[in-house]
């Protein structure tokens, strides 16, 4: 079930509806900064809502932070967001000492947009990086200040200047991104779509979401992305280092 969050430890599991699922609003529109929702359940892990704009930790991308606002104006800080016990449930983890919400209660949702937008820009930039460095991806992580990919490649083939220049040239092309859905069976028939060896595509609902950058990239991804790669602005290569036989790490940051 996952670790117990100290902010809600000791409270009994309470549910407003038998079906504890969450409408993933961030999946349909990553640019939603605020929304409204109803509390579905309170568990030892945190708060489950009937819908959310908060992206949960996954695919190397950090979970969103922000606040839930009660009808009386009281603000509950959300310190992290994680996946729930089912494919389409999301747990909002309140900061320690936060007031406890009640099942059925209506709340307003506000994400830390500046942080999220940085994550979106960097996540899309990493997709471009995976096209510039043509090698199996063995790991990755996206934080607000920088992102990184690990590659199974010889260090001698990684030149920071070339990588930075080619990635920024792709960004400058200003290509719009697209969301494509395929079935699990269609993905199984096209294994080459999966570049990342350490992260499995988001399965479980019978279909898989792909990020398409026409003419550049197509791969499974459940994360949040910019509408046009020009929004990334530009990136800089922070460092390249050897993390092991099959892990050569390329770290990037936004240039502005």
Go through the PLM ranges and name each one:
Residues 2-256:
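Active-/binding-site microenvironments in catalytic and ligand-binding cores
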């Amino acid at each position: 079930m996952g670790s117990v969050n100290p902010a809600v430890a000791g409270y009994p599991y309470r549910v407003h509806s038998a079906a504890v699922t969450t409408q993933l609003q961030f999946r349909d529109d990553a640019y939603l900064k605020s929304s409204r929702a109803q509390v579905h359940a309170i568990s030892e892990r945190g708060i489950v809502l009937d819908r959310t704009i908060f992206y949960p930790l996954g695919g190397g991308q950090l979970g969103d932070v922000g606040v839930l606002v009660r009808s009386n104006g009281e603000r509950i800080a959300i310190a992290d967001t994680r996946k729930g016990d089912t494919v389409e449930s999301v747990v909002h983890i309140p900061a320690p000492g936060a007031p406890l919400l009640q099942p059925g209660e209506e709340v307003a949702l506000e994400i830390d947009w500046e942080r999220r937008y940085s994550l979106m820009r960097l996540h899309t930039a990493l997709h471009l990086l995976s096209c510039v460095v043509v090698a199996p991806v063995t790991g990755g992580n996206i934080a607000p200040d920088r992102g990184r990919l690990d590659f199974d490649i010889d260090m001698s083939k990684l030149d920071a200047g070339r990588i930075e220049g080619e990635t920024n040239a792709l960004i400058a092309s200003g290509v719009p991104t697209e969301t494509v859905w395929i079935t699990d069976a269609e993905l199984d028939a096209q294994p080459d779509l999966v570049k990342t060896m350490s992260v499995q595509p988001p399965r479980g609902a019978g279909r898989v979401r792909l990020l398409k950058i026409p003419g550049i990239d197509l791969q499974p991804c459940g994360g949040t992305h910019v509408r046009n790669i020009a929004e990334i602005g530009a990136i800089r290569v922070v460092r390249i280092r050897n993390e092991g036989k099959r892990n050569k790490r390329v770290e990037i940051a936004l240039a502005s």
